[in-house]
């Protein structure tokens, strides 16, 4: 059993190299974002005192389910800034989705809607509680935005859902947003 601090550090590093900087660990992702688990294991072993079993434990116990491990290959489920194709299928969203952010972002969002910024998609939550957890990672006061996903979908916008249940959209125009979801 590895210490929680090391587990967190290894998990964050895995997210970093599998989503943003595979070169930093000497890895090459395929077009779908996959890399050989053996290659990742070697890269992690050169930086951390961690076993194959401990890496698997990190993947399986990650509360956010950030990774998928299949057929001796691994990838991050979403949040990439490197160019990959997750081969996501379109899905009909629930009536409402939610986005947690900091209050300081509200002026920009109110003018321009939610943009994907450096990522491939805007990340949305299926419930207010998850959005609150996301918002808590931001500095300052937090707000939870409600997305009228049913209307957005009916008006031709596409939604996708990742392997770990995060809803994804290219953008969320301002007319589909309201600020009163679970916040004062």
UniProtKB/Swiss-Prot annotation:
This is Probable RNA 2'-phosphotransferase. InterPro entries: Ptrans_KptA/Tpt1, RNA_2'-PTrans_C, RNA_2'-PTrans_KptA, RNA_2'-PTrans_N. One of its GO terms (molecular function) is NAD+ poly-ADP-ribosyltransferase activity. Keywords: NAD, Transferase. Its EC number is 2.7.1.-. Belongs to the KptA/TPT1 family. It comes from the Bacteria. It is an enzyme of class 2 (transferase). GO terms for biological process: tRNA splicing, via endonucleolytic cleavage and ligation. Removes the 2'-phosphate from RNA via an intermediate in which the phosphate is ADP-ribosylated by NAD followed by a presumed transesterification to release the RNA and generate ADP-ribose 1''-2''-cyclic phosphate (APPR>P). May function as an ADP-ribosylase. PANTHER family: PUTATIVE PHOSPHOTRANSFERASE, TRNA 2'-PHOSPHOTRANSFERASE 1. Coiled coil: none annotated.
